[in-house]
Regions:
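Conserved, structured core segments of small domains
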Residues: 1-116
């Protein structure tokens, strides 16, 4: 089985829209989203290698030094699957973008490290 990194993507505009939602409605949606995410984890537990976590602020390090930067990555999960397509299918209708204000999930294969 191959390993794949799933990056949860969420734009600032989607989050801003979420925050304008009626507080009671948002709380209900958050509760339902957490429950749906838990069901997704249970349904895919054999494929999940690392549940991952939310991601915080970003620092960029380059030849010019260290600086603050922004991106739309909000979290990650590592899964295993027979193919890239099958890994992507695990995230169809995922609560990240079906219930929560996430935009998408990007899936990339974790390739073996080349010999040094």
């Amino acid at each position: 089985m191959k390993k794949f990194l799933a990056i949860y993507i969420g734009s600032a505009s989607a989050l801003a829209k979420w925050k304008t939602m009626d507080e009671e409605k948002r709380k209900q949606q958050e509760k339902g989203g957490k429950e749906a995410w838990g069901r997704w984890v249970m349904a895919n537990e054999k494929s999940i290698v690392d549940n991952g976590s939310p991601l915080g602020k970003t620092k960029r390090i380059s030849a010019q030094g260290i600086s603050d930067t922004k991106n739309e990555m909000t979290g990650y999960t590592i899964v295993q699957a027979e193919s890239h397509e099958k890994a992507a299918k695990l995230f169809e209708n995922h609560p990240h973008f079906m219930i929560f204000p996430g935009d998408s999930v990007e899936i990339m294969e974790c390739l073996p490290m080349p010999e040094m």
